[in-house]
């Protein structure tokens, strides 16, 4: 064989070898891939889910890898297509994911998720006073208002639901619409800076930022706490038992429920703003699905 042909064959074989090893990463078939809605800043999420991956790997004796996503819809899409095996969803995104992925299983929620709340915050220069009832939300008409992510349960869906109960539409805010900051942390920032006069976000994130000194209470304050509703939960893809062995999904649930407030687990729970994870079921989220359909977020 001429030298040129031998070179071409060698190059083709080398290229095939590269493609065959990179088309499917070696960790993809054997690693549990976990993800979460990006509801806070990436630095905190990377730390939280990095620690959780380590905790689960030790409990399950399988490699666990955290794979971040760019936005809420991306978490639902990655779960549907198999890019993520286990995802920490909000109430709405969890319902969306399960409707798009038949056989998906709700595994757990935090001890705070069965009775969750959102808070409405206001810039102190807005002159807005504390609100004592849902009907009091009418006082926000004409204000610059920001939700968090468009697909957030605590930062958009439920706040809009309560606004609707008060008879206030997003078109009645300043500029004829509400803004979307993208995350709970960002909502605090845009209201605190005065870019928006009012915003709605996850109460747990607000309390965490307050505790860590990241809120200037001379510039922003809580004016209303919503009634309770069910929110975040862990959802697993179908087929994990086939991939990791019989009973794996149950073991995964037990691993989450078994995280203790000591050692690495203590930090994980603190970052989640919880004392423990508790069992959860899909039936708890029927009200969220109903509100999602009413507001056009589920079709």
Regions found by a protein language model. Give the residues of each.
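A bilobed periplasmic-binding-protein/Venus flytrap-type ligand-binding module shared by bacterial periplasmic
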Residues: 38, 118-130, 230-244
């Amino acid at each position: 064989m001429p030298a040129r042909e031998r070179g071409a064959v060698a190059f083709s074989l080398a290229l095939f070898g590269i493609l065959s090893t990179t088309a499917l990463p070696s960790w993809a078939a054997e690693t549990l891939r976990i993800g979460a809605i990006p509801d806070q800043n990436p630095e905190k999420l990377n730390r939280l889910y990095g620690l959780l991956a380590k905790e689960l790997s030790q409990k399950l004796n399988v490699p666990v890898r955290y794979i971040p996503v760019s936005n809420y819809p991306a978490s639902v899409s990655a779960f549907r297509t198999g890019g993520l095996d286990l995802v920490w969803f909000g109430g709405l995104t969890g319902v969306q994911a399960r409707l798009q992925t038949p056989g998906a299983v709700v595994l757990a929620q935090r001890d705070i998720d069965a009775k969750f709340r959102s808070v409405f915050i206001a810039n102190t220069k807005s002159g807005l006073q504390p609100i004592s009832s849902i009907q009091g939300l009418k006082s926000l008409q004409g204000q610059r208002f920001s939700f968090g992510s468009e697909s957030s349960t605590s930062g958009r869906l439920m706040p809009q639901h309560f606004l609707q109960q008060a008879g206030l539409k997003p078109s009645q805010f300043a500029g004829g619409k509400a803004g979307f900051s993208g995350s709970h942390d960002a909502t605090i920032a845009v209201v605190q800076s005065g870019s928006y006069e009012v915003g709605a976000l996850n109460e747990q994130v607000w309390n965490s930022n307050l505790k860590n000194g990241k809120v200037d209470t001379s510039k922003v304050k809580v004016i209303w706490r919503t009634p309770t509703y069910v929110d975040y939960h862990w959802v697993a893809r179908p087929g994990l038992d086939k991939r990791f062995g019989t009973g794996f999904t149950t073991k995964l649930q037990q691993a989450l429920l078994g995280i203790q407030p000591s050692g690495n687990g203590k930090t994980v729970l603190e970052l989640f703003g919880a004392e423990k994870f508790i069992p959860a079921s899909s039936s708890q989220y029927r009200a969220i699905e109903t509100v999602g359909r009413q507001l056009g977020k589920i079709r």
